[in-house]
């Protein structure tokens, strides 16, 4: 119901205030979402198995296409014995340095109350950067890194499933024309079933990936038996000799080598789900040994037969096992794709809660796992873009050119944010922080440089996708800040309003009115409009603010603050982390059972009315945003999920009142 029919066309604005000071202390306070007691024994094994299914799907399916790209890609080298040993040496040391040394040993230590990922890292370091210019640079870098991850979420399902299904052309060349249609069918089904959630099949992800890793390890051992001299590739001298021999061409091959470490960022992003120890355990005990055995096996096949470079993975498989292996590879590719899709959903929720994205529909698909969510808007965009990529690029080799830029760009940005954590939070001296940062950047930028030359061959896609997403995220952030400043400047101080109410004593009616507001120090405009037009107030007025904290989750004991304001007014402040979804009715229902310092509140649903403001925005105000950005912000606002739906308010108990605002 609405008191202003014209308001239906405009966006609702419930301003998101800056994170409260509580976020400062919470970063180093007691553990919440991500921190857990160190897992041991069977618990460690179960978490490690789960990590195999979620964390290592992307990097685990890289053998399908990575080595092939190094020798047959746009910048591939001839599969001579010296080049094979050189490339395999680069593969071994890339995995060892980037994944084991950089991410597992250092980056995973930079957690936001146990949560990892680039937005969690941005939230952590942003509040500790005192210089405005430095903070703006961090935000730009973090947002662009997050934008690149969306591109990764589109490319990974496409290249993984394509790489798996391409085994058909090895098993039966006559089936080659079926590769793209089968891939499109699998991807369409995968995105279609997202709405039902993955709880039913999620339990098999870990076992599927364990079977996959065992299979590729066995295949690798089989290949090594052809020519065990491939094991010499662990010597770094072969990598050095490779660069000396191939010079610039050798540098460009890094664009293919980087494919063996795609998914490295997932180790960090999924840290909050499994913990550091299970992720490290799964990598060192299962994933890395299996991957290295398989890459060495592919290298041995290439030493034995250089013509195998056209598809060294499937040519490592004996003829009788080709079709079963295609099935296992496809299952593994689906698991890898699911992990990236779920990651995009989670990233979107973080962006919404941190104020970088409009409200979107977030549906929980599991009654037991809070992290299992479905975001229809993101699913539709990812699905359409992924299928379009398959139809446009048609092969994993063509897609490989597009893949590396998103991955290496994100890795370089993570390194820069890690440096701020080391300097500002850990108080590392310059002599300790800078050498490590420069070493990480040297490797990251080498990989990025080798990929940036592939812009015309497909690298344009992740850059274009990232630029598009970055524009949306940054526009929304700037628009929300400008809108909050506008409303804060025009707002009536709450204490002045309460003094006026105590003096004028307006007529009161039975029941409770809940007014949603983003600013705890001023009166919600919708309350002023209500009092001006209706001339009455409810017996009890609850001013409710939902605060988004820059931490993954808020401890239950710190969730709600209640304060008696006098004259029948009560202020309720509820805090949520960026991994949580606010539910206002559930929050109110929990109040009678909480130990609070303020007054006891018990709302009767049928006697409670929720009041929301719905503002029509015009791009003609004093904001310093460019006019095109204002128009884009207004379009995004109009298409955002309604505040009543996002906060879980009962539709038949909501009153919306509208006004015009010039941005």
UniProtKB/Swiss-Prot annotation:
Reactions catalysed according to its record: K(+)(in) + H(+)(in) = K(+)(out) + H(+)(out)
Keywords: Cell inner membrane, Cell membrane, Ion transport, Membrane, Potassium, Potassium transport, Symport, Transmembrane, Transmembrane helix, Transport
Disordered: annotated segments: 1-23
Membrane topology of the entry: Multi-pass membrane protein
Pfam families reported for this sequence: K_trans (PF02705), K_trans_C (PF22776)
Subcellular location, principal: membrane
Sample GO molecular function, one term: symporter activity
Family membership noted in the UniProt record: Belongs to the HAK/KUP transporter (TC 2.A.72) family.
Protein function: Transport of potassium into the cell. Likely operates as a K(+):H(+) symporter.
Protein name: Probable potassium transport system protein Kup
Organism: Anaeromyxobacter sp. (strain Fw109-5)
């Amino acid at each position: 119901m609405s008191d202003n029919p014209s308001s239906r066309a405009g966006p609702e604005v419930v301003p998101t205030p800056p994170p409260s000071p509580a976020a400062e202390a919470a970063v180093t306070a007691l553990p919440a979402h991500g921190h857990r007691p160190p897992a041991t024994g069977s618990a460690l094994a179960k978490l490690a198995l789960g990590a195999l299914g979620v964390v290592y799907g992307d990097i685990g399916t890289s053998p399908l296409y990575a080595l092939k790209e190094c020798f047959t890609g746009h910048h591939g080298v001839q599969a001579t014995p010296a080049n094979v040993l050189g490339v395999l040496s680069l593969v071994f040391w890339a995995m060892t340095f980037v994944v084991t040394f950089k991410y597992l040993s250092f980056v995973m230590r930079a957690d936001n109350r146990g949560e990892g990922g680039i937005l969690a890292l941005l939230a952590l370091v942003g509040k500790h950067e005192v210089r405005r210019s430095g903070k703006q640079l961090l935000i730009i870098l973090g947002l662009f890194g997050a934008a690149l991850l969306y591109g990764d979420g589109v490319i990974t399902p496409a290249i993984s499933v394509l790489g798996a299904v391409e085994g058909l052309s090895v098993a039966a060349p006559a089936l080659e024309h079926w590769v793209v249609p089968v891939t499109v069918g699998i991807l369409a089904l995968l995105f279609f079933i997202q709405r039902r959630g993955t709880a039913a099949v999620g339990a098999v992800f870990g076992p599927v990936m364990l079977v996959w890793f065992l299979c590729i390890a066995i295949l690798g051992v089989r290949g090594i038996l052809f020519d065990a001299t491939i094991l010499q590739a662990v010597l770094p001298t072969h990598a050095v000799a490779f660069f000396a021999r191939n010079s610039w061409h050798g540098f460009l091959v890094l664009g293919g080598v980087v494919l063996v470490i795609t998914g490295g960022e997932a180790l960090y992003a999924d840290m909050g789900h499994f913990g550091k120890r299970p992720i490290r355990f799964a990598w060192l005990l299962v994933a890395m040994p299996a991957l290295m055995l398989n890459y060495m096996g592919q290298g041995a096949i290439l030493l034995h037969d250089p013509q195998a470079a056209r598809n060294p993975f499937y040519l490592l498989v004996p003829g009788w096992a080709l079709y079963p292996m295609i099935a296992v590879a496809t299952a593994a590719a689906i698991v890898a794709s699911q992990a990236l899709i779920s990651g995009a959903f989670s990233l979107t929720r973080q962006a919404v809660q941190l104020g970088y994205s409009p409200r979107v529909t977030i549906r929980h698909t599991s009654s037991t796992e809070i992290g299992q969510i479905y975001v229809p808007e993101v699913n539709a965009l990812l699905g359409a873009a992924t299928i379009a990529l398959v139809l446009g690029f048609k092969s994993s080799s063509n897609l490989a050119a597009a893949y590396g830029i998103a991955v290496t760009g994100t890795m370089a940005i993570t390194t820069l944010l890690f440096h701020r954590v080391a300097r500002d939070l850990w108080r590392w001296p310059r002599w300790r922080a800078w050498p490590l940062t420069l070493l990480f950047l040297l490797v990251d930028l080498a990989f990025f440089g080798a990929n940036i030359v592939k812009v015309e061959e497909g690298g344009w896609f992740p850059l274009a996708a990232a630029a598009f997403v970055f524009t949306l995220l940054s526009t929304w952030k700037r628009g929300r800040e400008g809108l909050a400043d506008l409303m804060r400047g025009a707002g009536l101080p709450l204490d002045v309003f309460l003094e006026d109410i105590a003096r004028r004593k307006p007529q009161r009616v039975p029941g409770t009115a809940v007014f949603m507001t983003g600013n705890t120090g001023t009166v919600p405009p919708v309350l002023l409009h209500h009092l001006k037009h209706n001339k009455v107030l409810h017996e009890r007025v609850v001013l409710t603010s939902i605060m988004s904290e820059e931490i993954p989750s808020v401890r239950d004991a710190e969730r709600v603050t209640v304060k008696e304001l006098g004259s029948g007014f009560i202020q309720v402040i509820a805090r949520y982390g960026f991994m949580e979804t606010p539910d206002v009715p559930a929050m109110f229902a929990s109040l009678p059972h909480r130990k609070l310092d303020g007054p006891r509140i018990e709302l009767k649903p049928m006697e409670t009315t929720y009041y929301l403001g719905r503002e029509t925005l015009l791009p003609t105000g004093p904001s310093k945003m460019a006019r095109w950005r204002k128009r884009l912000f207004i379009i995004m606002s109009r298409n955002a999920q309604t505040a009543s739906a996002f906060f879980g308010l009962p539709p038949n108990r909501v009153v919306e009142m509208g006004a015009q605002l010039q941005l």
